[in-house]
Amino acid sequence: MTLASQIATQLLDIKAVYLKPEDPFTWASGIKSPIYTDNRVTLSYPKTRDLIENGFVETIKAHFPEVEVIAGTATAGIPHGAIIADKMTLPFAYIRSKPKDHGAGNQIEGRVLKGQKMVIIEDLISTGGSVLDAAAAASREGADVLGVVAIFTYELPKASQNFKEAGIKLITLSNYTELIAVAKLQGYITNDGLHLLKKFKEDQVNWQQ
């Protein structure tokens, strides 16, 4: 079983992911979605957490061997990033969604040197907007952002476009395609549900029609 499949299985087992193709969720953006993901739940399950953190470490070593500092996005990327940095014996920092409105007005908390090679940790990629904003902030403060590594992606076309336009490499440990395949195999969804979930990936607006 691949890492992506193992993580997808764990996310379903611990109910970090809910699939309701016949009774969709409403995202903050207003999009009706057959999937809801809360990867913060993974922190409460040592087996799942260990699988994910070890997956992060191996992925970073394989794709970004020159990394010098790990950064987590506030707030979801912070605990994962701190664990990864500890496992890799690397410095850690975190990136706020916006600068503090008091004190030194920092957007990056922790010490990042000019030109230091950074990998940013995120828990979930939908469109990628927030983590790309974090990457831009890190670059403005002098970091050399090598890429983003995340637990899971919905594989939305908008995310691919956004990362391509930003020139930022994205690697994820698991993904939507893998998850719905595992969900069908393990009986979480019906054939009709799988069909709707596949349609959502292709067209987030008209998938119910």
From Swiss-Prot:
Q: Which domain of life is it from?
A: Bacteria
Enzyme Commission number(s) from the entry: 2.4.2.10
This protein's pathway: Pyrimidine metabolism; UMP biosynthesis via de novo pathway; UMP from orotate: step 1/2
Any GO MF annotation of the entry = magnesium ion binding
| Pfam families, A to Z | Pribosyltran
Required cofactor(s): Mg(2+)
Q: Which reaction does it catalyse?
A: orotidine 5'-phosphate + diphosphate = orotate + 5-phospho-alpha-D-ribose 1-diphosphate
Which residues participate in 5-phospho-alpha-D-ribose 1-diphosphate binding?
A: 96, 100, 102, 122-130
Q: Keyword annotations for this protein?
A: Glycosyltransferase, Magnesium, Pyrimidine biosynthesis, Transferase
Among InterPro entries, the record links this protein to: OPRT (IPR023031), Or_phspho_trans_dom (IPR004467), PRibTrfase_dom (IPR000836), PRTase-like (IPR029057)
The biological process GO terms on file are:
'de novo' UMP biosynthetic process; pyrimidine nucleobase biosynthetic process
- Which residues are recorded as binding orotate? 126
Family (UniProt): Belongs to the purine/pyrimidine phosphoribosyltransferase family. PyrE subfamily.
**Quaternary structure and partners:** Homodimer.
* Biological function: Catalyzes the transfer of a ribosyl phosphate group from 5-phosphoribose 1-diphosphate to orotate, leading to the formation of orotidine monophosphate (OMP).
Q: What name does UniProt use for this protein? A: Orotate phosphoribosyltransferase
Give the originating organism: Streptococcus pyogenes serotype M1
Its organism's taxonomic lineage begins at: Bacteria, Bacillati, Bacillota, Bacilli, Lactobacillales
